[in-house]
Regions:
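Beta-propeller fold detector
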Residues: 21-32, 77-86, 128-134
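Repeated scaffold domains used in trafficking and secretory/extracellular systems
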Residues: 31-44, 88-97, 133-147
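Acidic/polar, low-complexity intrinsically disordered N-terminal segments immediately downstream
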Residues: 109, 114-116, 120-123, 127-134, ...
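C-terminal hydrophobic structural anchor segments
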Residues: 68-110
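Acidic, serine/threonine- and glycine-rich low-complexity intrinsically disordered segments
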Residues: 1-49, 53-56
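Short beta-strand elements that form the blades of beta-propeller/WD-repeat-like
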Residues: 1-4, 47-61, 101-111, 148
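Short, solvent-exposed coil/turn segments at beta-strand boundaries
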Residues: 15-18, 42-49, 93-104, 123-125, ...
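Beta-propeller blade signature
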Residues: 6-19, 64-76, 117-124
């Protein structure tokens, strides 16, 4: 049995300076996705989060995490990211996005062509293709800073 929780996949929060979960905040993500759950979540900026989503319910067989979505905490809205390759072509994502100036940069590997870095705008939930790398896969992306 895959599902081991009593609630559907969702979001809870701990307010600043609080010691526990906010009992008045729970957002059911499966209600917004037709029963799909998420595998990972990363903070981007303010109350925007990038989620790695499964393509189908965990109660079905053959599920895979091949979609990205943006969750905004204030509104509780989940929006799938547009501008990425078709989910059936995506074979993987980088382990962790690089975040800078309010944008997330995610490595995307497909079954066609070379992997690429996509810049994701969380406000519009839009990805823009950047550089492609002549490789089979990109596990991560980052930025080197000079030491002072």
């Amino acid at each position: 049995e895959v599902q081991k929780t009593t609630l559907p996949a969702g979001v809870v929060r701990i307010k600043a300076n609080a010691e526990g979960f906010d009992p008045d905040y729970y957002c059911n993500l499966e209600a917004q996705t037709g029963g799909k759950a998420f595998l990972r979540c990363w903070h981007i900026t303010e109350d925007y989060f990038l989620l790695l989503m499964y393509d189908r319910s965990l109660t079905e067989t053959g599920f895979t995490a091949n979609q990205l979505a943006i969750y905004q905490g204030e509104t509780g809205k989940l929006t799938y990211v547009t501008g990425l390759p078709s989910a059936d072509l995506i074979s993987g994502f980088g382990n962790t996005p690089y975040v800078e100036n309010g944008y997330a940069y995610m490595a995307v590997t497909t079954t066609e062509g070379y992997p690429s870095i996509y810049k994701i705008d969380p406000v519009g939930a839009v990805a823009t293709k950047g550089v492609s790398i002549e490789a089979t896969q990109i596990s991560g992306v980052g930025k080197l800073q000079p030491q002072n």
